Every structure is written in C-alpha cells, then in structure tokens.
C-alpha cells in the first residue's frame, strides 16, 4: 500500500499532506540553521564522505558504500565507515564492530559492510561519536565514509553522494509521509555526485547497476551459478524486495515463491525454515544472510551483488577522494 501511495497510484497521499508540510517545514528549518551557522556541525580531523539518499526505502546505497570503500582500499587509502545502525540496539554507543558483533547489536548494513570490506566500522545515533571511536582505535584512518546520514547535519562533510533508484526515482515528489522524500529533489543541485541505480540516468548522473555474483551456501561457503539451484524460494528483507526478485529472474531463476520481508526485520530459525518445504532451496539477499548465518540450514543460499558504475565520472570521483584523503 505504501508503494502505491508514494508513487501516486493511490489518492490516499492527499490525506497525508498536512503531515508532509510539517515534515518539510521542520527538515528545512534544521538544514537552514546549519547553513546559517545558527547550529554548529562537528568537523572530523579527516575528510568525511556521506553516501545517502533523498528518499526512504532501498535505493542500492549499501552496495555503493562497499564499492567506494573497496576502490579506495585498492588505491592504498585507509578507510573507516560509520552508520546509525538502524535495526540494531547496542548496550552502549558508540559501538566499534568486531568479528563477534551481531546484527541485533549493530544493524544489518554495518555488519555486511564490515564483513565485505574488513574496514573499521562504528555505529552510533550520534555519528560524530562513531567517527571519534574509529579514530581513537585506528588513528591511521585517512577518510571516513558514512553509510546514510545525508540529513544528519550535525556531522560536517566534505563530499556528498546521493544514490537514486532509477526506476522509482522520487515517486509523487512529496515529503514523508505522503511521499517518499526526506528532502526535495532540488537538493541534488548542492551534492557532489548523483548515482542512479537502474533506469535511465539523466544528464550529470552516474549510471549504476547491481551485478549479481555466484550464489553462496550459508553453511559451507560453496559457490555455484544461482540458475543451477532448483525449486527456489526467494526471500528478501530489504528496502525494495521486488528488485531482488527481478535480479533472480534476470539470472534465469523462476522462484516457486517470493517472500518480501520488512527492511531490518529480525529473523530466527523457526520463521525462516518455515518458508521452505522439503526439496526446496531458499535463496536470500546478502543482507539477510548476515542475520541467518548462525542458524542456517544446508539448503540456504544467498546471492551477493556488486555495484557497477559506468562512464568516466566514477574514476574522477575516486581521484578526487584519493587526493582528499592524501591531504592534497
């Protein structure tokens, strides 16, 4: 229902307009206060890059963060990552992730990023505290990438990158809750790069698509072509589950059942195992896999995806960030 409201297919969005006007007024006032320096943002001693979005829901932001961290690491840059840690609840903050940190403590995306990149990752509702925790333990870190937080103006930033779903884009264009917007589309004029996941990019936007890899068995780590798996049940607890189901079909998989779950939904063995019958194979997102690995069964697999950015702009962006991190 919420997708229909935000896309404009349902007329119910009009009933929510008063709340949207209030949301827009408050969010605009907050940004203006920082712009006029009525409120002071904390500036880290190293450059900060924000990877965020203008809309609620999944846009492919986490794969972009992973891509960015890995690309900078390949260039010899030591990167740290901070996040709010949505979906997690730590005993205390800031929380610096380790191999023993669970998604219940830190949230799905931070654990996934930590496992994929081996970069220092810290979470805190106050992102400046997370930055301080990383720099205290890893003083050699040269640049911080913040996963989400475009609207978290308490943390000063040097570069802003926005990720857009190229198919859904901005829906009906209204602020939450009548529409998907956290900020209006005009905010794009002030950011450093706009990355468009799928769809048809517009002038000045960097095209991106998600490239699926081989399916990975949660229990054994065995890899295979996902099309070789039979009697597949697809499960996705991400911001926009239909994108994952479409990816499977693009890979030649016709799921016998598709199970969309809420983003950041907690998972347990009983609930997940009940999704498949004898002889069926469960295929999930990598984000779900970080929550299920501890209790996975032999017929559970996940399909990792990597961000693939096209054109000349990604190289220019990476050069800019490398020079920034190097102090040039």
UniProtKB/Swiss-Prot annotation:
Q: Which domain of life is it from?
A: Bacteria
Q: Do the record's keywords include Lipid metabolism?
A: yes
Give me the reactions it catalyses: lipid A disaccharide (E. coli) + ATP = lipid IVA (E. coli) + ADP + H(+)
Amino-acid positions noted as binding ATP in the UniProt annotation, renumbered to this chain: 55-62
GO CC terms in record: membrane; plasma membrane
Family annotation (InterPro entries): LpxK, P-loop_NTPase
| EC supergroup of this enzyme | transferase
Q: Mind listing the UniProt keywords for this protein, alphabetically?
A: ATP-binding, Kinase, Lipid A biosynthesis, Lipid biosynthesis, Lipid metabolism, Nucleotide-binding, Transferase
Biological process GO terms, please? Answer: lipid A biosynthetic process; lipopolysaccharide core region biosynthetic process
Q: Which Pfam families match?
A: LpxK
The catalytic activity of this protein is classed by the Enzyme Commission as 2.7.1.130
Any idea which GO molecular function terms this record carries? ATP binding; kinase activity; tetraacyldisaccharide 4'-kinase activity
Question: What pathway is this protein a component of?
Answer: Glycolipid biosynthesis; lipid IV(A) biosynthesis; lipid IV(A) from (3R)-3-hydroxytetradecanoyl-[acyl-carrier-protein] and UDP-N-acetyl-alpha-D-glucosamine: step 6/6
Q: What function does the entry list? A: Transfers the gamma-phosphate of ATP to the 4'-position of a tetraacyldisaccharide 1-phosphate intermediate (termed DS-1-P) to form tetraacyldisaccharide 1,4'-bis-phosphate (lipid IVA).
| Cross-referenced NCBIfam families | lpxK (TIGR00682)
- Report the sequence similarity comment from the record: Belongs to the LpxK family.
Q: What is this protein called?
A: Tetraacyldisaccharide 4'-kinase
Q: Which organism is it from?
A: Escherichia coli (strain K12)
Q: Which gene encodes it?
A: lpxK
């Amino acid at each position: 229902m919420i997708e229909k409201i935000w896309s404009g297919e349902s007329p119910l969005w009009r009933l929510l307009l008063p709340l949207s006007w209030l949301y827009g007024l408050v969010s605009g006032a907050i940004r203006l206060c920082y712009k006029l320096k009525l409120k002071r943002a904390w500036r880290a001693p190293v450059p900060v890059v924000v990877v965020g979005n203008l809309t609620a829901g999944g846009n492919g932001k986490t794969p972009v963060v992973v891509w960015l961290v890995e690309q900078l690491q390949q260039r010899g840059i030591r990167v740290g990552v901070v996040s709010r840690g949505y979906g997690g609840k730590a005993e205390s903050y800031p929380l610096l992730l380790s191999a023993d940190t669970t998604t219940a403590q830190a949230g799905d995306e931070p654990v996934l990023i930590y496992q994929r990149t081996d970069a220092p990752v810290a979470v805190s509702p106050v992102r400046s505290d997370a930055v301080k925790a990383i720099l205290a333990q890893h003083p050699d870190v040269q640049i911080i990438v913040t996963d989400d937080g475009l609207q978290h103006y308490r943390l000063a930033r040097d570069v802003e990158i926005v990720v857009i779903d190229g198919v859904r884009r901005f829906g009906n264009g209204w602020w939450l809750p009548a529409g998907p917007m956290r900020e209006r589309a005009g905010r794009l004029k002030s950011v450093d790069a706009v990355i468009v996941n799928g769809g048809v990019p517009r002038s000045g936007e960097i095209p991106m698509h998600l490239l699926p890899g081989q399916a990975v068995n949660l229990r054994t780590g065995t890899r295979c072509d996902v099309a070789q798996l039979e009697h597949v049940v697809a499960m996705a607890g991400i911001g926009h589950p239909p994108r994952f189901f479409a990816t499977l079909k693009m890979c030649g998989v016709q799921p016998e059942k598709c199970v969309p779950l809420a983003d950041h939904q907690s998972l347990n063995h009983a609930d997940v195992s009940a999704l498949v019958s004898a002889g069926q194979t469960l295929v999930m997102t990598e984000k779900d896999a970080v929550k299920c690995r501890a209790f996975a069964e032999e017929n559970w697999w996940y399909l990792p995806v990597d961000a693939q950015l096209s054109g000349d702009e990604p190289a220019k962006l990476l050069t800019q960030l490398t020079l920034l991190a190097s102090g040039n």
